[in-house]
Curated annotation (Swiss-Prot):
UniProt GO MF annotations: ATP binding; ATP hydrolysis activity; proton-transporting ATP synthase activity, rotational mechanism
Protein's recorded name: ATP synthase subunit beta, chloroplastic
Organism from which the protein derives: Huperzia lucidula (Shining clubmoss)
EC number: 7.1.2.2
Family, as annotated: Belongs to the ATPase alpha/beta chains family.
Gene this protein is translated from: atpB
TM region positions: none
Top-level taxonomic group: Eukaryota
Amino acid sequence: MEINPFALGVSTLVEKNVGYITQIIGPVLDVAFPPGKMPNIYNSSIIKGKNPAGQEMNVTCEVQQLLGNNKVRAVAMSATDGLTREMKVVDTGAPLSVPVGEATLGRIFNVLGEPVDNLGSVDAGTTSPIHRSAPAFAQSDTKLSIFETGIKVVDLLAPYRRGGKIGLFGGAGVGKTVLIMELINNIAKAHGGVSVFGGVGERTREGNDLYMEMKESKVINEQNISESKVALVYGQMNEPPGARMRVGLTALTMAEYFRDVNKQDVLLFIDNILRFVQAGSEVSALLGRMPSAVGYQPTLGTEMGSLQERITSTKEGSITSIQAVYVPADDLTDPAPATTFAHLDATTVLSRGLAAKGIYPAVDPSDSTPTMLQPWIVGEQHYETAQEVKQTLQRYKELQDIIAILGLDESSEEDRLTVARARKIERFLSQPFFVAEVFTGSPGKYVTLVETIKGFQMILSGELDNLPEQAFYLVGDINEATAKAATSQVEN
């Protein structure tokens, strides 16, 4: 029986262990095997045949439960429309395997590791199973260092750890995906780093936008595909829950190869981790498990841990993971975001209030929690500047109610100065993105950490008190703000 060579790393499959479908419940199948030939949990099985309309079918599924009486329950990785009872199911004898290595860069894959970009087959030469153990404790690297992103608000107030796990928390439409796209762009251009993007249950349009954006910015080089810096793995909203549940593991497996074999520092982007949880919840219900808190699966902690514990730094290389986390109804106590919190080194919370003001990226400094913002890690100058910025913004927040009642004129001179500087800081935290040039009309800017610290120190010290606050909006470094102020003065 011919099967997909990219899914399993073999060109033909010997029918050693053949079962047949006994029941189909949406994306979940019950399969009977001969006595003594039960497949293992997580083994992949192939269903090939013709549907009632005479069309060829090729469905891969993964064993999830052993039911007894020589039956297993499996979850399909693609649509089950057209499958019928009594169809033959061939056990491959191994978990799902996907292509890994340089051949994956610049290409788009589905959960099975099949290329879906119409650019031909992938000559990877090597495949890896998507189910693996986390690196041994002795292999872990505990060294702390900052990962510069070129985004002012992130680098100053919520710095990322190299080899850490970072969560982007926010409701719908506050800019999580745009921030991820900018990070991929900056990391590829400034660091020459390799990235793997896992699109887990997000909109197909967003996946297409990301691909087009990566081509425009030359992160994916269509003319010379080997020079590309990112591999894309998609399991979008229209896919069955099995694919959405496993596509994160496919992306992670590709990233692990760059870390373990090529000994590189890799970036792994997952958008969106909540869709991974939701897919697990759908599968859990179909497998007959009793729901837990708020209807989520009882195995939520285990499923999250099996993904997150593999994302780590070793002495050979690192995986720095940035995960978008959709927060249902903006409720951070929901079990899905709450379970994710436990695994993260830093959280970047995106605020609807800031987005409404037009401050992009809409990162909320008061809600974001960086574990790396310690003087012995980032240095005294960075730490003190960040603390002073936070204190100024916090004081501004406290004064807003008083100003709303009495007006700014009734405030003390000191409070008026604090408000003026805080408003400049708030605007200076905005930044034009390379990937959002179409929307903002401003060319994107990469700002180094040194320039970022210098700019905020100048605002805090009062050197720029005479400049209008609008000069600080959507600029890169502080020199641009002063130039913008000078230009507007001439125009007026």
